[in-house]
């Protein structure tokens, strides 16, 4: 990567990436056009998302076809890059002037088959056999926690329910998570520190000097009746031209209402709400944050967010983390990464933000 901005160099390190589309390496083509790259790595069946913002002032960029597959590797110049998976182009937007192209892609599309409703009953079997059958049906490799494989399943029905929904329900019953990452069906206990192939992950240590900012939240699960998150579009330049193309869906298309430039999203009821301090860039992000915090409150977990000054492409969701330099109860807790956001931009270089959680039952506060 050869950004012209010296602001990208942090401690004599320069961000680097490798991008291919439909098997063709376009890293060099994008080298001087990249205005921003954001990769969000989510836990569970929520699709990972890749956003690319490119300079098209000369009008020479060819629009990618809908459904094209993008592969990404990310890291630092002079060091091995870390593969971050394959993503299907879901939405493209061209705006101007000045002309720029935004490409939005989501983790390669396993969702159509996993979202097909089925009728199935299992009787006198094990968790391992159930997960194995579903993995085989979708041509996925299986990464199953050994402590879950032999758990007995006396009887369970899948009634007019998709495999994705059924796996999530089964995972909740056994205190596990279900996810698809890079062609692997992952079914493991939360916070067990397993990779997508089921191998143990080393505990990552993060010190306070590694971060630009942090936020810790601990609340009584019964104290709040809802969560509110606010959004405000902060990047709304005047548009002379705007073209948006979305992938065709099998479901009936409905007219999309224009999104308000600002607002609040409430999950739960408004008798006694927890208001998130952060203002999000759009309604979708605010909705996701509110729902995530509400689920945390219902599960009874403490949450901790960190903005790292230097990006860590080697981090993945479900990695176990130890932190130091904060309050003692925070340092003593065993954290797990639930969401990762990698960002590359001319202004801030390569940074990584982490969302971590720990069960309140495992958290002691004097």
Predicted region positions:
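Short beta-strand-centered interaction patches in the first periplasmic/extracellular domains
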Residues: 2-5, 100-109, 146-215, 221
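Amphipathic, non-transmembrane alpha-helical segments in extracytoplasmic/periplasmic proteins
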Residues: 49-53, 105, 119-143, 158-181, ...
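Short glycine/serine/proline-enriched coil/turn segments at secondary-structure junctions
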Residues: 79-81, 95-97, 179, 186, ...
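Short, compositionally biased
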Residues: 86-95, 120, 192-194, 334-346
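Short acidic, glycine/proline-rich loop/turn micro-motifs
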Residues: 114-118
């Amino acid at each position: 990567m050869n950004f012209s901005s010296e602001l990208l160099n942090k401690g004599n390190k320069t961000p680097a990436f490798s991008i291919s589309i439909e098997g063709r390496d376009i890293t060099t083509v994008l080298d001087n056009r990249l205005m921003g790259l954001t990769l969000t790595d989510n836990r569970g069946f929520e699709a990972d998302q890749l956003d690319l913002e490119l300079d098209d002032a000369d009008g020479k960029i060819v629009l990618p076809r809908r459904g094209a597959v993008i592969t990404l590797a990310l890291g630092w110049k002079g060091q091995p890059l870390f593969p971050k998976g394959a993503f299907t182009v879901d939405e493209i937007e061209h705006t101007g002037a000045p002309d720029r192209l935004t490409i939005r892609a989501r983790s390669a599309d396993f969702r159509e088959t996993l979202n097909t409703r089925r009728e199935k009953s299992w009787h006198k079997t094990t968790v391992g056999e159930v997960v194995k059958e579903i993995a085989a049906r979708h041509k996925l490799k299986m990464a199953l926690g050994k402590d879950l494989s032999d758990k007995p399943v006396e009887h369970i029905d899948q009634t007019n329910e998709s495999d994705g929904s059924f796996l999530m329900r089964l995972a909740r019953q056994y205190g596990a998570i279900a996810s698809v990452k890079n062609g692997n069906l992952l079914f493991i206990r939360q916070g067990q520190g397993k990779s997508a192939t089921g191998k143990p992950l080393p505990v990552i240590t993060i010190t306070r000097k590694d971060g630009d900012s942090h936020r810790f939240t601990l609340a009584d699960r019964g104290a709040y009746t809802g969560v509110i998150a606010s959004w405000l579009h902060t990047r709304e330049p005047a548009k002379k031209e705007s073209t948006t193309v979305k992938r065709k869906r099998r479901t009936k298309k409905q007219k999309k209402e224009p999104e308000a430039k600002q607002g609040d999203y409430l999950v739960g009821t408004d008798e006694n709400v927890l208001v998130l301090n952060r203002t999000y860039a759009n309604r979708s992000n605010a909705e996701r944050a509110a729902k995530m915090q509400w689920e945390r409150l219902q599960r009874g977990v403490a949450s901790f967010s960190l903005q790292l000054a230097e990006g860590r492409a080697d981090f993945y969701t479900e990695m176990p983390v130890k932190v130091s330099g904060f309050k003692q109860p925070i340092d003593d807790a065993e954290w797990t990464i639930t969401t990762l956001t990698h960002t590359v931009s001319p202004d801030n270089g390569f940074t990584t933000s982490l969302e971590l959680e720990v069960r309140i039952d495992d958290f002691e506060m004097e």
